[in-house]
Amino acid sequence: MTDAVTAHEMQQYDQYTINEIGVPSLVLMERAALAGIEVLGAGQFDLSQVLVIAGLGNNGGDGVALARLLMQKGVHVDLLFVGDENRAAHNNAIQLEIAKKYGLTPVNKVKDFRQYTVIVDALFGIGLSKPVPIKLGEMIKRVNAANVPVVAIDVPSGINATTGDIMGSSIRATATVTFAYPKTGLLQGEGVKRSGSIFVKDIGIYSPAELHQFNPEIKEN
């Protein structure tokens, strides 16, 4: 397994890929969504009734894209968008508009999470740096109590991607689809207990050192 990275390192590699290499951030978001679908569709999960929980950030944008792509494949999927759509990150807002144009209308609440056969967690990603708000923590507890398989996108929501600490409340995932490199927080502390099976997926983000192996003209740092 490739060496694990901290949240800060991953954010640097992400920005390097976008700003220096020139891969558009929306392309990375689509690839992340496709990677999630690859894990969901590998046979371990029942896709007859899927719920995707998406937050306001780019992790939520991954979730919105994933929900739309599932719908396009004929999967019955509900998209629970948590928060004010007007406050969504730029690329997340774009994904929302695309989803709506394809006919996927988000919902803003779910009465009973037990009605779903699998839940995709795209509420918080590696950028979480403060405790989960109490109201969202209560929702996370309801998801955990539903005893439905959960696939987390990048990290289980509420887990610090660097330390593995629980930031107030956290999802208990059956599986975690993480991108480019394992995150240190998935391999220590509560992160180990909350991540389930970890799938590391290549979506086109690399460290400068790794890119140097492809192209020696690229500086290693």
Curated annotation (Swiss-Prot):
Pfam families: YjeF_N (PF03853). InterPro entries: YjeF_N_dom (IPR004443), YjeF_N_dom_sf (IPR036652). Residues 10-211 form the YjeF N-terminal domain. Binds 1 potassium ion per subunit. One of its GO terms (biological process) is deadenylation-independent decapping of nuclear-transcribed mRNA. (6S)-NADPHX binds at residues 58-62, 125-131, 154. It catalyses: (6R)-NADHX = (6S)-NADHX; (6R)-NADPHX = (6S)-NADPHX. One of its GO terms (molecular function) is mRNA binding. Catalyzes the epimerization of the S- and R-forms of NAD(P)HX, a damaged form of NAD(P)H that is a result of enzymatic or heat-dependent hydration. This is a prerequisite for the S-specific NAD(P)H-hydrate dehydratase to allow the repair of both epimers of NAD(P)HX. HAMAP family: NADHX_epimerase. This is NAD(P)H-hydrate epimerase. It comes from Weissella koreensis (strain KACC 15510).
